[in-house]
Amino acid sequence: MRSKIWNNLIAGLTALVLAATLSPAASANPDDETTNNPVSCTANKAMEQKTLGKFHAYVINVDTGEVLVDVRGTELTPSASVIKTLTAVAALQKIPADYRATTQVLTVPNEPSTLVIKGGGDFTLTRLVAGESSVYSKPPRIRTLARDTLKQLSPELPITKIILDDSFFRGETWNPDWPRKYRTLGYVSHITALQSDGDRIQPNRLISSYSFRRGKDPVQKVGEVFREFLGERATGAELVVGQTPSDAVVVAQVQSQGMRENWLGHMLTFSDNTAAEFIGRHAAKAAGLEPSIAGTNRVIKSTLRELGLRPKALVIRDASGLSDQNRVHSKLLAELMVKVAKAENGLEVLTNWMPISGQTGTLRYRFQGKSAIARGHVIAKTGYIPGLYGLSGIVNAADGSRLAFAVFARADQETGVSVTYTAQGAIDKVVARFYVCGASLTQ
């Protein structure tokens, strides 16, 4: 009897062990936020968050080329600042590696009391002096221009007129798509080839009155500051906007930091809109196009075509992403990030400049809570305009795979769906799932 009971007990335990081994319940929920199941792993639950509004996503396994997620991947959406990745790519392909923007002072032979200050498209030129700090690294100074100019002039010669030449750029200085309040909010300045400190009202970041607010006339402001630094000899000098006479002679000049090593990194890390617009115009000029809004838009699309992408459907209205009329799709952005990850055409340098999750730039304070698992593993460009949040970049996933992605959370007027700042955290949850799932990500 005891033998029979013992045999039955062993048989029962064996059945339990086999059931535990074979049952699907032995695996964690593949869409659970805490799982890292290598067999089947999705971000579906995260992508269904209501705070994402109308959601777009496209994810590609960099090494295999497999498309892992496609949610409205080819449907057009406003871009916000994610478009700065396209601007950076155009700059990398068109602008010489050692290029620097130059601001010059010239004299006019038949008008000895006239000076010209000629802008070369340098928004980092600063009116600040020693002991004051710009948001830009090692900027050229207007004071240096004034000092070097005075050294070249006869000490008895008065300065009665200063010509302000901002003709290096063409066309409108304010994009008609931008709300006027973007200037007073400090989002962007007028895009003039002659300006200082991105035309911030108070550019010294070391004092409490530091302000991102931008001025109304950046060209005039440079003239006023230059005249002041020239001292008593120029006190009554007339400021006139005009072009440089053909016989003018350069007597002083200053140059920006290298555009590639300095400007592009600043633009992508801190999402500087003024920087993006200047860089876009320089890229257009380098490509033989007009350095204007239209030229910028053309150089971005033509560069993408040259890289083997298909930008025909895209609508590019500016270089910064402030226009709500820009239209991109997540598929092309993800395909571009594949090229970045694979170091094609020198694009790998973008990974040195794009923000890193939880560490740098506009992602420094992102990826909180459960999403913190992906901190340090996502390199991506953020985007925001009213009604839309975006993120596009590369995930270095937990399993060692690399995923190129682009996601957008947007409002939808047709259905009445809206999005708020909470969409940022929701996007972080989605991308954290990409990190957890890696090559096993499915939809």
Task: Kindly give the residue locations of the regions a language model identified.
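Active-site SXXK
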Residues: G65, S79-A97, L194, V225-F229, ...
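Small-residue-rich helix-loop
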Residues: L68-D70, A284-Q443
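Bacterial N-terminal signal peptides that target proteins for export
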Residues: R2-G12
